[in-house]
UniProtKB/Swiss-Prot annotation:
Subcellular location: Cell inner membrane; Cytoplasm
GO MF terms, alphabetically ordered: ATP binding; metal ion binding; protein-exporting ATPase activity
Catalytic activity entry: ATP + H2O + cellular proteinSide 1 = ADP + phosphate + cellular proteinSide 2
Keywords: ATP-binding, Cell inner membrane, Cell membrane, Cytoplasm, Membrane, Metal-binding, Nucleotide-binding, Protein transport, Translocase, Translocation, Transport, Zinc
Cofactor note: May bind 1 zinc ion per subunit.
Residues annotated for Zn(2+) binding in this entry: C890, C892, C901, H902
Membrane topology category: Peripheral membrane protein
Coiled-coil positions: none
InterPro entries: Helicase_ATP-bd, P-loop_NTPase, SEC_C_motif, SecA, SecA_CS, SecA_DEAD, SecA_motor_DEAD, SecA_preprotein_X-link_dom
Protein name, as recorded: Protein translocase subunit SecA
Residues the record lists as binding ATP: Q86, G104, E105, G106, K107, T108, D499
Length: 906
C-alpha cells in the first residue's frame, strides 16, 4: 500500500524538489538581463543588495537575483555555469537544510550561492571542510568569484598565527576546517582580552562532507589539555607484565569493545606484580593501596588486545598517532585520554608522554549547534536523515543528478575465507589492468591496504597506495585514479572531496610543471594526453570500484561506490566479502555460515544470495543503530557540561568586557566576611562559645587581615558589628594596594586574577566531571537513572566550583603583590601577559598555574597540579592528595574540613 501511495503522490523528498524546481524558473528568467550587465555593473550588484538589506529587505527578498548574479560571475570568472540542480542545492543550503548531491555534481560551486547571499549581511559565513588541503583549494578557486563581486575571502588552516587568523575570520566568507574552528572557539575562551580573540559571533555555516563531520566525528570531542605530573615509568612496567599474560587470563567482547581479567588472570597478574615488587606479596590487586594499578592494567590490556597498529593507530617519528576509522586519515594533535595513549606508547616502545588534564573541551555536536543557521552538503546523508533531524534539527533533501547515473552496481561476492576473496580480487584487478580499465580498491585500514599492495607487487601490477601514511599526496593520487591502467588502493574514504576524472585531472598535472621551460607546449601536451586517455578509459568501461569489505555503515559503502560514475560517466562497483571479515565475523557469521553450509559452498567458489545480502544489511543496520544510540547518549551527557560551559564562557566574556572590576570584588568580600564571622561566631551563640583564635587565623588566610582581639573584648559588640569591621579592614587593605600600584593597574590585576582563578576552578571542575562520568553508569545497578544522577551531581559540583571560585579569588586579591622593578611608572595599562610576568604570589597555590591560553594541543603547557580521585589518596601521605578543595573533608580522616585541618596554614 505504501509503495502504491508513493507512486501516486511521490515521496516528501520528491515533492520538495518539485517545488524547488518551480523556484528555479524565477532565477532563470533573470539570466538574460544579468548577462547584459558589464563587469562593473555586475560587481555593483553587491552594493545594491547591501543597500536593500540596510533599508529593511530580507535575504529571501533578494535570493533569486543574488543567485543569478553569482551564476553569471562564476561563468565569467571560472568558466562554470551553475546547473539548475546546483541552484536547487543552493536554495536548500540557504534555508538551513542538508543537500544530498552525488559525487561530481559540483558541491563546491553550489556553496558559492548561499555563501555569497548570506555574506551580504556583513556577519560572516563559514564554509567548513574536513582538511587543510580542501580549505586552501576551495578558498582559492571559489574566492575568485567572491572577489570579483567585491567580497573578501579568508582561509584558516592549522599553524596560523592569531593575527592572520583574525583577519581571515573577519573576511566576508571564511573557508576553514572543522577542527580549527572548534579549537579556535576553545582557545578564544581561554584568552584574557577581547582583542586577542580571533572568531566573530556565530552566524551561518555551510559544512562540506556534513555526514563525516556531524556523524562520524561526533563521538570524538575536541580537547585542549595540559600535562600533569604522572608516573610514566609505571606504564612501561605494567606493559612488560601484561605481555606475559595468557589468552585465558582475560576475556574480551568485540561487540561491546570491553576487556576484563578472569579469576585466573587476576591470580596470575598478582604473582607477576609481586615478583616485580610493584605490590606487596601478601596483598591483593583490589586492596585499597593497589587499586590505582587496576587502571594501568586495564589500559595495557586494551592497548594490546583491542587496538592494532596501522589499523587504529600508526607509529610515525617515534609518536603514536590516531587513525580516523572513517576516513583513514591521521588525526593530528589528538591523543586518547585516560592513559590509553600512554599504554599504546609503552606497547610500541616509544617515549611515553605525560598524561594530560583537560583545560577545555567541546564536541562537534555542541560546537555546530552554536550557529543560528546551519546547513551542509554531502553525497550520502539520507541513511542518517533521522539522526540529523533529531540532533541538529536539519532536514535532508536529495537532489537529482544533472546527468543520468549510468554506473552499474554489481552484486556482492561472498567467499569462505580471506585468501579466496583476495584471489578473486586479484583476478579481477588483473583483468581490468590488462584492458586498461582504471581501478579503485577500497580497504578499511592501512594494514589491509598494505597487505593487498604486497600481493599486487608479487604479481607485478603497478599501483598507488593512498592511506594515512601518505596524507600529503592524497589529493594528487586520488585525482589521477581515473587514468588509463591506473590501479589505486585507498583506505576507506581517504581523498574524499577530490573528484576522480576519467583520463586524469589535467589541472593537477599542470601545477607540477616547471613554468620556465616550454610551459605552454607542455600544457597542450598534457591536455591532449588526458583527452586521449579519457576515450580509452570510457571504451574500457570507466572507473571500476572494488570494495574489499563491507563497512559498519551503509553510508560509507555508498560513499565508496559514489567515486565511480560521476556526471554520467560509465563505471562499475563490486564488493568482495569473506566470513573472516570483521562485520561478518562479529555480527552475522552464524546466520550466514548456516546458509553457506546449506548451499554446499566449495573452496574458491563465490555465492550470490538475496538472503545473505539481507542478513548483511541487517547487521549493518544493527551497528548503525548501536552507534546512533552511543552518539545520542554522548550528547545527553555532554549537554549537561555544555550548559555549564556556556555559563562559564559568558561570565568570562563579561569579566573581560567589564570596565569596573570592583563590583564583584566588593560583593564577594562582603559575602565571605559574613560567612567566616558566622562560622566562628554563630547567631544566637554565647560569647564564651566564640572561636576568636580560629576566626583570626581564617581572616588572615583569606583577607590577609591581622585581626585585633580587643575588638571582641567589648561587652556590647555584636556579630554584625564585627562583620562590618572585617569588611572595612578588607577594603582598607585593597585601598592601600591601589595607592601603591594605581587604580588602573589594580583594576587590570583584579580582572586578571578573576580570569585565572575562573580558569583554574573550571579546569578542576572538568576533571571532577570526567571522574563522575566514568562511574555513573554503575548507578543503574541501584535502580537509578545514570543520566538523572549525573545531572544532579554535576549541578552540585558546579555550585561547589562557584564557591571555590569566590574563595580563591578573594584570597589571591588580598595576598598578591606586583613587582614594580620592571614596570614603567607611566605604563599603567599593562597587558595581561605583562601582568602575568610581573605578578608574584605570597604563597604557592594551584590557582596561579600559568599556561598560554592561546596554545594549541602541540604547545608545551606548564604542568598543573591535578585533583586526585579521593580513593587514590593515602591518608598518611599528604603528597599523594593532589589538589584539595578548602571545603572538602580532610583526606587524613580527621572528619574536619581541609581548611581547618591540614590546610589551616595555607
Amino acid at each position: 500500500m505504501l509503495s502504491i501511495l508513493k507512486k501516486l503522490f511521490g515521496t516528501a523528498n520528491d515533492r520538495t524538489v518539485k517545488k524547488l524546481f518551480s523556484e528555479i524558473t524565477k532565477i532563470n528568467s533573470l539570466e538574460p538581463a544579468i548577462q547584459k550587465l558589464s563587469d562593473e555593473e555586475l560587481k555593483n550588484k553587491t552594493v545594491e543588495f547591501k543597500e536593500k538589506l540596510k533599508n529593511g529587505a530580507t535575504l529571501d527578498d533578494i535570493v533569486y537575483e543574488a543567485f543569478a548574479v553569482v551564476r553569471e560571475a562564476a561563468k565569467r570568472v571560472c568558466g562554470m555555469r551553475h546547473f539548475d540542480v546546483q541552484l536547487i542545492g543552493g536554495l536548500i543550503l540557504h534555508r538551513g537544510m542538508i543537500t544530498e548531491m552525488r559525487t561530481g555534481e559540483g558541491k563546491t560551486l553550489v556553496a558559492t550561492l548561499p555563501a555569497y547571499l548570506n555574506a551580504l549581511t556583513g556577519k560572516g559565513v563559514h564554509v567548513v571542510t574536513v582538511n587543510d588541503y580542501l580549505a586552501r583549494r576551495d578558498s582559492a578557486a571559489m574566492g575568485k568569484i567572491y572577489n570579483f563581486l567585491g567580497l573578501s575571502v579568508g582561509c584558516i588552516v592549522g599553524g596560523m598565527p592569531d593575527e592572520v587568523k583574525r583577519a581571515a575570520y573577519n573576511a566576508d566568507i571564511t573557508h576553514a576546517t572543522n577542527n580549527e574552528l572548534g579549537f579556535d572557539y576553545l582557545r578564544d575562551n581561554m584568552k584574557y582580552s577581547l582583542q586577542e580573540r580571533v572568531l566573530r559571533p556565530f552566524n551561518f555555516a555551510i559544512i562540506d562532507e556534513v555526514d563525516s563531520i556531524l556523524i562520524d566525528e561526533a563521538r570524538t570531542p575536541l580537547v585542549i589539555s595540559g600535562p600533569v605530573n604522572d608516573n610514566a615509568e609505571l606504564y612501561g612496567k605494567i606493559d612488560k607484565i601484561v605481555r606475559l599474560l595468557n589468552a585465558s587470563d582475560f576475556e574480551k567482547d568485540e561487540k561491546l569493545k570491553t576487556i576484563n581479567l578472569t579469576e585466573t588472570g587476576i591470580t596470575h597478574i598478582e604473582s607477576l606484580l609481586s615478583k616485580e615488587n610493584i605490590i606487596k606479596p601478601d596483598t591483593s590487586l583490589y586492596d585499597f593501596e593497589n587499586l590505582t594499578l587496576v587502571h594501568y592494567i586495564n589500559q595495557a590490556l586494551r592497548a594490546h588486545n583491542m587496538f592494532t597498529v596501522n589499523v587504529d593507530y600508526l607509529v610515525r617519528e617515534g609518536k603514536v598517532m590516531i587513525i580516523d576509522e572513517f576516513t583513514g586519515r591521521v588525526m593530528e594533535g589528538r591523543r586518547y585520554s585516560e592513559g590509553l595513549h600512554q599504554a599504546l606508547e609503552a606497547k610500541e616502545n616509544v617515549k611515553i608522554q605525560n598524561e594530560n588534564q583537560t583545560l577545555a573541551s567541546i564536541t562537534f555536536q555542541n560546537y555546530f549547534r552554536n550557529y543560528p543557521k546551519l546547513s551542509g552538503m554531502t553525497g550520502t546523508a539520507m541513511t542518517e536523515a533521522p539522526e540529523l533531524k533529531d540532533i541538529y534539527n536539519l532536514d535532508v533533501v536529495a537532489v537529482p543528478t544533472h546527468n543520468k547515473v549510468t554506473r552499474l552496481d554489481l552484486d556482492d561476492e561472498i567467499y569462505g575465507s580471506k585468501k579466496e576473496k583476495y584471489d578473486a580480487i586479484l583476478k579481477l584487478i588483473r583483468d581490468c589492468y590488462d584492458r586498461g580499465q582504471p581501478i579503485l580498491v577500497g580497504t578499511i585500514s592501512i594494514e589491509k591496504s598494505e597487505e593487498l599492495s604486497s600481493v599486487l607487487n608479487k604479481e607485478n601490477i603497478p599501483h598507488k597506495v593512498l592511506n594515512a601514511k601518505f596524507h600529503e599526496q592524497e589529493a594528487f593520487i586520488i585525482a589521477q585514479a581515473g587514468r588509463f591502467k591506473a590501479v589505486t588502493i585507498a583506505t576507506n574514504m581517504a581523498g574524499r572531496g577530490t573528484d576522480i576524472m576519467l583520463g586524469g585531472n589535467p589541472e593537477m598535472l599542470i601545477e607540477q610543471l616547471d613554468k620556465e621551460h616550454n610551459y605552454e607546449a607542455k600544457i597542450a601536451e598534457i591536455k591532449a594526453q588526458i583527452a586521449e586517455e579519457k576515450k580509452q578509459v570510457i571504451e574500457a568501461g570507466g572507473l571500476f570500484v572494488i570494495g574489499t569489505e563491507r563497512h559498519e555503515s551503509r553510508r560509507i559503502d555508498n560513499q565508496l561506490r559514489g567515486r565511480s560514475g560521476r556526471q554520467g560517466d560509465p563505471g562499475k562497483t563490486k564488493f568482495f566479502l569473506s566470513l573472516d571479515d570483521d562485520l561478518m565475523r562479529i555480527f552475522a557469521s552464524d546466520r550466514i555460515s548456516g546458509v553457506l553450509r546449506t548451499l554446499g559452498l566449495k573452496d574458491g567458489e563465490a555465492i550470490h544470495h538475496p538472503m545473505i545480502s539481507r542478513s548483511l544489511e541487517k547487521a549493518q543496520q544493527k551497528v548503525e543503530g548501536h552507534n546512533y544510540e552511543m552518539r545520542k547518549n554522548l550528547l545527553r551527557f555532554d549537554d549537561v557540561m555544555n550548559d555549564q560551559r556556556k555559563i562559564i564562557y559568558e561570565q568570562r566574556t563579561e569579566i573581560i568586557k567589564s570596565k569596573d572590576s570592583h563590583g564583584f570584588l566588593n560583593s564577594t568580600t562582603e559575602e565571605l566576611a559574613k560567612k567566616i564571622v558566622l562560622t566562628f561566631m554563630p547567631v544566637g551563640s554565647y560569647r564564651e562559645d566564640w572561636d576568636i583564635e580560629n576566626l583570626s587565623v581564617e581572616l588572615h588566610r583569606v583577607f590577609s587581615i591581622k585581626f585585633d582581639h580587643n575588638v571582641v573584648s567589648k561587652n556590647d559588640v555584636t556579630e554584625e558589628e564585627i562583620t562590618k569591621t572585617v569588611i572595612q579592614m578588607a577594603h582598607d587593605i585593597y585601598k592601600s594596594k591601589e595607592e601603591a600600584y594605581s587604580s588602573e593597574l589594580m583594576h587590570n590585576a583584579v580582572k586578571y586574577i578573576l580570569l585565572t582563578t575562573l580558569d583554574q576552578v573550571w579546569k578542576d571542575h572538568l576533571y571532577s566531571l570526567d571522574h563522575l562520568r566514568q562511574g555513573i553508569s554503575l548507578r543503574a545497578y541501584g535502580q537509578k537513572d545514570p543520566l538523572s544522577e549525573y545531572k544532579r551531581e554535576a549541578f552540585n559540583l558546579f555550585e561547589q566550583m562557584l564557591n571555590n571560585l569566590k574563595e580563591l579569588f578573594i584570597q589571591t586579591v588580598y595576598h598578591f603583590h606586583i613587582d614594580l622593578k620592571n614596570v614603567q611608572k607611566e605604563d599603567v595599562s599593562l597587558e595581561y601577559k605583562k601582568l602575568q610576568k610581573n605578578m608574584c604570589e605570597s604563597r604557592e597555590d594551584p590557582a596561579f598555574s600559568k599556561y598560554n591560553a592561546g596554545s594549541s594541543l602541540e604547545t608545551d603547557l606548564k604542568p598543573v597540579v591535578s585533583r586526585i580521585d579521593p580513593k587514590d589518596r593515602n591518608p598518611d601521605d599528604p603528597t599523594s592528595w593532589g589538589r584539595v578543595s578548602r571545603n572538602e573533608l580532610c583526606p587524613c580522616g580527621s572528619g574536619k574540613k581541609y581548611k581547618y585541618c591540614h590546610g589551616a596554614n595555607e
